[in-house]
């Protein structure tokens, strides 16, 4: 069976969406002195870096960015293809931070549950919020993003593929049916 690919966000639409996410994060954060972004490997990391660049452009403040690997915190290791763990790099103290976890797509909520468990091993932020580029629904856990770039109702058998310039040489979001 041939799969069809539908572009959901073009490079320009992604740029605008990232700018909007940055603006929403700034508005909700209020005081930016304790704001920090933590991208979830793999695509959440460059996404967090792009959002941080936009915040700096908008506000003139450099927001610290970290990278979180959740491989060994997952509850579905027996069901997924195990990848080589990435490096967690958190170059700031999490304690007391206004932390925004960033991921490309939220689906069942299990990645975010694992990320929350991992964060607790590194410190205790004052508040943890969640920003995602795409929310495709079908949650299995009571986890919802605070900031969403695009809500995209999908069928369970469909896939959402995010392409990022830093990793893939282009920016786009596609729905694979």
Curated annotation (Swiss-Prot):
Q: List the Gene3D superfamilies.
A: 3.40.50.2020
> Coding gene?
pyrR
Question: Which keywords label this protein?
Answer: Glycosyltransferase, Transcription, Transcription regulation, Transferase
The enzyme class is transferase
Glycosyltransferase recorded as keyword: yes
Q: What is its EC number?
A: 2.4.2.9
A Pfam family that the UniProt record links to this protein: Pribosyltran
The family assignment reads: Belongs to the purine/pyrimidine phosphoribosyltransferase family. PyrR subfamily.
Catalysis: reaction(s): UMP + diphosphate = 5-phospho-alpha-D-ribose 1-diphosphate + uracil
Q: Name the job this protein performs.
A: Regulates the transcription of the pyrimidine nucleotide (pyr) operon in response to exogenous pyrimidines. Also displays a weak uracil phosphoribosyltransferase activity which is not physiologically significant.
Q: Which organism is it from?
A: Picosynechococcus sp. (strain ATCC 27264 / PCC 7002 / PR-6)
- Record protein name field: Bifunctional protein PyrR
**Where is the motif named PRPP-binding mapped on this chain?**
99-111
Protein's GO biological process = regulation of DNA-templated transcription
What NCBIfam families is this protein classified in?
PRK05205.1-1, PRK05205.1-5
- GO MF terms on file? uracil phosphoribosyltransferase activity
